[in-house]
Amino acid sequence: MAQYLCLNQEETKQLLDAYEIDTIGAFTFYRRKHIQTFFKEADHVLDQDHPMTEQFTYSEEVLIDDVYTGKINVEHILYTLYSHETREENPHVRIMEQPYEMSLILDSFNHLSSDMPITHLFCLDNSQKQTKNHEFYNLQCLNNLLPVILRNKNYHPYYYYSNVSIMNEHDVFYPNVMITTRYVFTYTNDHSQGILYKTPQIVNAFKEKFDAYIKEASCFMTRESWVDNLTDIQTFFNTQTITRELMTTPCPTYVFEESDLAIMRKSLKDFFPDKEGFIKQFHDFANYWNQEFYTRYSDLFHIIYTVQGLRYTAKTGYLHDIPPELFNPLSLEDRLLLITKWKEFCKKHPYIMMADMPYLSETSTTYFQLSDQVFHMIAADSTGTLANISIQEVTLVEAFNDFFENVIKKNAYSKEEEIKLIDECIEMIKKEM
């Protein structure tokens, strides 16, 4: 039809988009677009270093009960309250504000302390109404809060549902609140005005009401630090029902045998922390994977990797599993062995699928794992420790499941095409040898 109508590339795209919107609905169409953007930007959020401020000047400002006007003054009070709270014996900050507006403030807080217990209550949308920018509001909240939970292991977000689009259309009387040990600060959505209270009875009343709300709310996401990387991953597989895993490059853990451990040993840089301990973990996990886990769950556990990641490993020798700062690239001989074994692994298992996902960086060291109830992102935090971030909110889990199904339907290669592309990489390596 596009050829018949003499449409250019952009007009053809608009026609195809209009057809898809008519087929699946605008909400699902734009939701998939936003999730694609999420994967494109995920490594920027998850893999970036989060430097902490070594020293800062604690505010000695004496706060008084008053009305504060102007965004600069309101945000100065928020920052000062947090600064004061860091010096309390049992610090705890309670916040009720939408992540859409609050993320920059939370991020700046963590320059003062990455250990501050923060309980954050906010509202998510359950309306499926499109905003004027076709935004997926709940995903935007996730984007804003990921850097916070990566930096602060004591950050605990909770949510309740309401129609956010209706809420945003009406002015609400001082809807936001920050509660510390000694103070309560209520303020407007635009941070133009706030009221500070420090009467103990008022502070305690706000704490009691906030804690009552938390009991009725649901956990948005959790963070679990994995210090013993592969051992913790094995425990994770034993306790979670994972149905899909998304990664970029071939994974040596799934195909290397005991005779291949020398490859990993020479590839890990000399300063790799507890190098021999990691090699032992690698060996133990490979045995667990091949002899226990995948023999039982190969029909349930679907692995998606990308053609971009395959080519990246073939060309560079780098892997998805280990950050390049800690890893010497595989030699041509070792690349050939890995990709040849990966080919046999893929031929044997129909649920190992290669997909074309150019928006997901081939250098990504982040794993994405999904079940029917939880979406997991496994990434390095600011200390280099693996952090398993688990999102449990229903609309987001549903959205990621839908996105993965669509990737498999539209962007996954057939098994014959997959093997052909792997063979091309094998031939490329052989020509360089």
Residue ranges of predicted features:
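Short amphipathic recognition helices of helix-turn-helix/homeodomain-type DNA-binding modules
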Residues: 3-53
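The feature captures two recurrent sequence modes
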Residues: 38-75
